[in-house]
């Protein structure tokens, strides 16, 4: 008799859980910082690189791209720029 009641109890429990609504968490109490979606060209380039690496798995080893920040692309070496500017300054 106990084995026959188990499916009935599970069915009722499932129906009760399906009718419950989740309560939203108040954003005032949440102190975590949400990650913002980046819309700059650098981030778009990184997302495109990730997509191409994952989609071209049949061409060779699918190595994940290195994670570089937005300051890496087009970054200049400050020492070289300063030295070049010093040659043009009149003394």
Curated annotation (Swiss-Prot):
Covalent S-S links between cysteines: 38-43
InterPro entries: Calcitonin-like, Calcitonin/adrenomedullin, Calcitonin_CS, Calcitonin_peptide-like, IAPP
Cross-referenced Gene3D superfamilies: 6.10.250.2190
Pfam families for the chain: Calc_CGRP_IAPP
Cellular component per GO, a single term: extracellular space
Location relative to the cell: Secreted
SMART domains assigned: CALCITONIN
Any one GO MF annotation of this record: hormone activity
Signal peptide: 1-22
Propeptide position ranges: 23-34, 77-91
Residues that bear Tyrosine amide: 73
Record's function text: Amylin/IAPP is a glucoregulatory peptide hormone that plays an important role in the regulation of energy homeostasis. Selectively inhibits insulin-stimulated glucose utilization and glycogen deposition in muscle, while not affecting adipocyte glucose metabolism. IAPP function is mediated by the CALCR-RAMPs (AMYRs) receptor complexes. Amylin can also bind CALCR receptor in the absence of RAMPs, although it is more selective for AMYRs.
Family membership noted in the UniProt record: Belongs to the calcitonin family.
PANTHER family, per database record: CALCITONIN-RELATED (PTHR10505), ISLET AMYLOID POLYPEPTIDE (PTHR10505:SF4)
Summary of subunit composition and partner proteins: Can form homodimers. Interacts with IDE and INS. Interaction with INS inhibits homodimerization and fibril formation.
Domain notes: The mature protein is largely unstructured in the absence of a cognate ligand.
Name used for this protein in its record: Islet amyloid polypeptide
